[in-house]
Design a protein with these regions (language model features):
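Nucleotide and nucleotide-moiety/phosphate-recognizing core
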Residues: 3-114
Length: 114
């Protein structure tokens, strides 16, 4: 499983951290967010919004991410933006290959299925 935290401005990703540490996402997410912000000299109050993937994805992972994002958005008074996982993957494909006409995003269901 992958847990990702990114900082973006406009359409550009300024920095990102991807964790591939098994099932420790709940314990690692908040410190990873803090590390990402500190390494970019950004305070939480500087953020304009908080975005989170809304699925599909791991049930527990989505719950941890959603709860963390919702708590941050609420405590900072910032908007919370839910982004469907497959929509984000399709957009990334088009960003990398602007000549493409179609994209078919898929994720590993961890059961030898997509």
């Amino acid at each position: 499983m992958v847990c990702s935290v990114a900082l973006s401005k406009g359409k550009s990703v300024l920095d990102a951290i991807d964790l591939q540490d098994g099932m420790n996402h709940a314990a690692l997410l908040a410190p990873t967010i803090e590390r990402l912000l500190q390494s970019n000299s950004v305070k939480p109050s500087d953020l304009d919004a908080i975005a989170v993937c809304s699925g599909p994805g791991s049930y527990t992972g989505l719950r941890v991410g959603s709860a963390t994002a919702k708590a941050m958005a609420y405590s900072l008074g910032k908007p919370l933006i839910a982004i469907p996982t497959l929509q984000a993957l399709a957009q990334a494909a088009f960003d990398l290959h602007p000549e493409a006409e179609y994209a078919l995003p898929m994720i590993d269901a961890r059961r030898r299925e997509v």
